[in-house]
Swiss-Prot record:
Domain MPN: 12-179
Gene coding for it: BRCC3
Lineage: Eukaryota, Metazoa, Chordata, Craniata, Vertebrata
GO MF: cysteine-type deubiquitinase activity; metal ion binding; metal-dependent deubiquitinase activity; metallopeptidase activity; polyubiquitin modification-dependent protein binding
Family: Belongs to the peptidase M67A family. BRCC36 subfamily.
Protein name in UniProt: Lys-63-specific deubiquitinase BRCC36
Organism: Pongo abelii
Amino acid sequence: MAVQVVQAVQAVHLESDAFLVCLNHALSTEKEEVMGLCIGELNDDTRSDSKFAYTGTEMRTVAEKVDAVRIVHIHSVIILRRSDKRKDRVEISPEQLSAASTEAERLAELTGRPMRVVGWYHSHPHITVWPSHVDVRTQAMYQMMDQGFVGLIFSCFIEDKNTKTGRVLYTCFQSIQAQKSSDLTHLDSVTKIHNGSVFTKNLCSQMSAVSGPLLQWLEDRLEQNQQHLQELQQEKEELMQELSSLE
């Protein structure tokens, strides 16, 4: 029995100007990842009517298939300066997030629309467009504060194997909670045994990696203590001999 997963956001509408800014920022360097924040609005609607006017048929199809439509509209982006020294990591500081929120409030007053920080974007130079485990964990952290928060990834500086030409891929993603073991009722016995053996093997490997150095340290410490005890016993015997000679 398949488990249907319902995400907090059903679609994302990225303005062309914001898309060009993200794309140019991603193509600005191939040596490290770049990042930024997205400003826009989140529309909630329980009807599938013409309120959302899109030129693409894909957006319209999504709006027709769901009962409660939650669509993120990204109108502007803010380019951020890197704060992580690792080239394959990006990190948004609280100060940067606060400054982006202030800018969103300014745009809200200027346009009269409920602008706010609705997501973040970053680049993947020379690697796949799919989010890494770090990206998924970071996205989950943001979604704890705002379920409508989305993440965008721009994969660039990659070559099409067939045409030998460069291409740029981009995607939008959100994090979801993993299925509980009780939901996996469709697994057969062989799969369960295999999963159990893999889990046991990984657990033993982790325990060995943790307990191995600890046991070695305890053995070295025991050897040092025994040697020190012998030295103390020898010193005690020498002192007893000196004491007996004085008597």
